[in-house]
């Protein structure tokens, strides 16, 4: 795999010993996650500046046994359910959200991988066991330069051509979250048949013909390494067409459970950012003592009200996420959860900036970084217009059935 120019960022802290020996109480697990949050926060600013893939963070997560958390226990993983996965994502996001977003993609892939019988069993086992033993990461590469996001419809421009040796894949994927750190690419493509097969082809990172174009220079979530990945006649075995179906008879890739997992975990990243922003503001208000006041800003009703607004927004988020994670929210509301949680998170950080003024936007403080990061919540699928249009359409459809 060829790469463009790449900066180097040395590990900024030692990787601690493995701490995930079972059994572990809920209290001990929560304490361990709090320590993990603090460790990740130590280098969050440096990763924001360098925009490098956070390799040291993933070494740390692997040492804690968290990269295989949603791999089934029979394959050596944690066998985690959605509440457990959400707890981890929230803790990681409070420390370094780019790391959390890449981890979300890992959890989503493995949460449903073993149930996907379209995959050959040996590939399902190989990918899962590598996640547990080696910390190998996987993500789906779907967005393309010409088409954009497949959530809006259309055929991929990436082509898989069947040959005697295997599939030859050519095309480009943009916004490829985790690119430099991934071991496996699940490449959304189509075959060159008259009625093309459309879906995912599994490609190992070391396959010849792969180039990463380092074009990710974003305002927020800078360490996600969401670069363009190009495939030039990349050869994979025939059984690596792991999840494909004819264009004339498409199969949905996500069922209701998958949609809830995606909504809850993705939203938890941005809620975690807002929690960190809230914590910074509270600390700053307690420490800031203007000479003409003779007391900290935290004693003023105006700032108490602002913190109350923020905490109420985050309370709403917690209620929504916990309800969905524990199975109390129907899957049809998955998009609304993402809309509400990310919207509340953005508003919470905006309130923190309004309250802190210039210090909040100073590069010497993390609040401006939290703001840049939290705004990225609006970009993820499903986007706000698609969510609200779908809800409105469903409302009118329900009325037409009643009549």
Please name every model-derived segment.
Residues 36, 267, 274-277, 281, ...:
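Amphipathic alpha-helices that form helix-helix packing interfaces
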Residues 36-45:
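N-terminal capping segment at the start of a domain
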Residues 55-63, 69-172, 177:
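Glycine-rich flavin
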Residues 172-212:
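A short core secondary-structure module
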